[in-house]
Amino acid sequence: MSRVANNRDWADDEDLEDSNELPQSTTTTNKDGTQTIVTWRFNDDGKKVKTTRRIRFTKVKEIVNPRVAERKSWGKFGLSQKDAAGPASDTTSVGENIIFRPSTNWRKDAKEEVSDAGAMKNKLKDKQVKCRICSGEHFTAKCPFKGTMAPLGEEGAVDVAAGHADTPEGPGGLGAGKSSYVPPHLRNGGAAGGERMGGGKFERDDLATLRVTNVSEMAEEQELRDMFERFGRVTRVFLAKDRETGLAKGFAFISFQERSDAAKACEKMDGYGFKHLILRVEFAKKAT
């Protein structure tokens, strides 16, 4: 029996050893500074798989503020003296970790943003600011006549001479011909402005503004002032002009200090010929 045991095939032990154990991992340092690491593992079929990896180590030198590096080397003190290195959850609040996801089409996205901005610029190139009250080239909020006349084309404007609208109000302050909601402050005469303290100066300015239409495009403000000052003191002259050409747009507003002077000018200047055109003069309507 001992002779049979001593005459076993040498491959039997090799197969037995290979089927149960994996060779040890080896790490070899090469002359170029890289390392070759050989590892073994079993795959899903129970076979040995050899993995060889070659690793190159690179040192990255980072330049930081010396003061920052010095603070990082400070030791903990006080109640946290025995704590481990790094931030502790009970004494340090760590900011949210923001995950950065780089985009592969960032150049395309940037071009689209530039093209969109260019298209919007071209779209707004021909747009001009136009006042809804006097059609001048300024914002409606900055119109010098926003308190003395109604927007052009509106039918519900309050006549200056009458002082109130002709449309009667129904029960509850709603319009008789409308079923839309009317805010409380506009019901039962709430829209009418209260009397101003100090006086008549502002009221005279509101009631003594004339609207002059069919004005020649070659007209100037000083010419209009000279014509209307014959009837009384003129406090303000506004002639709407085109911003690009500088020519008049065909209408103007003349404000007198006294309403009687404005009425006299309206009577005399309505139908007056000026630069081959017949002027149309009327009282400006007050905004509601």
From Swiss-Prot:
Keywords carried by this UniProt record: Cytoplasm, Initiation factor, Protein biosynthesis, RNA-binding
Cellular component GO terms held in the UniProt record: eukaryotic 43S preinitiation complex; eukaryotic 48S preinitiation complex; eukaryotic translation initiation factor 3 complex
InterPro entries assigned to the protein according to its UniProt record, in alphabetical order: eIF3_g (IPR017334), eIF3g_N (IPR024675), eIF3G_RRM (IPR034240), Nucleotide-bd_a/b_plait_sf (IPR012677), RBD_domain_sf (IPR035979), RRM_dom (IPR000504)
Domain RRM intervals: 208-286
PROSITE patterns (UniProt xref): RRM (PS50102)
MF term (GO), any: RNA binding
Keyword Metal-binding attached: no
Acidic residues bias locations: 11-20
Record's compositionally biased regions (Polar residues): 21-33
Stored SUPFAM superfamilies: RNA-binding domain, RBD (SSF54928)
Location of this chain's protein in the cell: Cytoplasm
Domain of life of the organism encoding this protein: Eukaryota
Region listing for Disordered, in residue ranges: 1-33
Keyword Chloroplast among UniProt keywords: no
Cross-referenced Pfam families: eIF3g (PF12353), RRM_1 (PF00076)
Protein's job: RNA-binding component of the eukaryotic translation initiation factor 3 (eIF-3) complex, which is involved in protein synthesis of a specialized repertoire of mRNAs and, together with other initiation factors, stimulates binding of mRNA and methionyl-tRNAi to the 40S ribosome. The eIF-3 complex specifically targets and initiates translation of a subset of mRNAs involved in cell proliferation. This subunit can bind 18S rRNA.
Subunit structure, interactors included: Component of the eukaryotic translation initiation factor 3 (eIF-3) complex.
Protein name stated in the entry: Eukaryotic translation initiation factor 3 subunit G
Upper lineage: Eukaryota, Fungi, Dikarya, Ascomycota, Pezizomycotina
Gene, per the UniProt record: tif35
